[in-house]
Design a protein with these regions (language model features):
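Flexible beta-alpha connector loops of hexameric P-loop NTPases
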Residues: 47-57, 105-114
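Conserved nucleotide-sensing/catalytic segment adjacent to the nucleotide-binding pocket
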Residues: 48-80
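Hydrophobic anchor at the start of a short beta-strand
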Residues: 33, 74-75, 153
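Short beta-strand-centered segment that lines the nucleotide-binding/catalytic pocket of NTP-utilizing
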Residues: 30-44, 79-80
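Short, basic phosphate-binding NTP loop
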Residues: 1-10, 17-30, 164
């Protein structure tokens, strides 16, 4: 993972959407990219169906090696709470990590909501000082994480206007 720019996102909902949107940004800049996520593993134009949101450690390293061999420079990756709890991404060198939302929908694999939150929060808490952590300030539980990471923090919000990035004047159209 050190040989490429790696973006990892955790959330209760929206991980897949975020990884696909991020890949579109990479493509807009003509960056050779890949996706690791719930639906597919995508290495440039090669697509394989996923078995897990975040592959087992050995498989994950195999995918990274294949991406390196194919000169992939940017990867967008979904990081599940179970993968974090089971240390599947331990020593994975993320350049950017994001935690965008949390709700008690997927706590069945954890002893409690607190354990579920702590698993997800570990992506932010263990981010290196050379990386960037993105946090949604509209999620009250995520706000303290800005002080619990060595990473450079970028915050955003729609309701909470104190973020690094704020959203306003939202218009929906069809």
């Amino acid at each position: 993972s050190k040989s490429m720019s790696l973006f990892g996102v955790t959330a209760t909902n929206g991980k897949t959407t975020i990884t696909y949107m991020t890949e579109e940004i990479f493509k807009a800049y003509q960056l050779k990219s890949g996706i690791i996520g719930t639906i597919v593993i995508k290495i440039d134009k090669e697509i394989e169906m996923s078995r897990l949101t975040t592959p087992e450690s050995y498989d994950l390293q195999q995918y990274f090696a294949k991406m390196k061999d194919q000169e992939i420079t940017h990867v967008s990756m979904e990081v599940s709470s179970s993968a974090l709890e089971l240390k599947r991404v331990y020593h994975t060198d993320f350049d950017v990590v994001a935690f965008t939302n949390i709700s008690p929908e997927h706590i069945q694999l954890h002893d409690s909501f607190e354990a579920y939150f702590d698993a997800k929060a570990s992506l932010i808490r263990t981010a290196s000082k050379m990386s960037t952590a993105i946090l949604n300030l509209d999620e009250q539980l995520l706000i303290p994480l800005a002080e619990e990471t060595a990473a450079q923090v970028v915050t955003f919000g729609i309701e909470n206007k104190s973020g690094t990035i704020t959203v306003s004047d939202i218009r929906f159209s069809s």
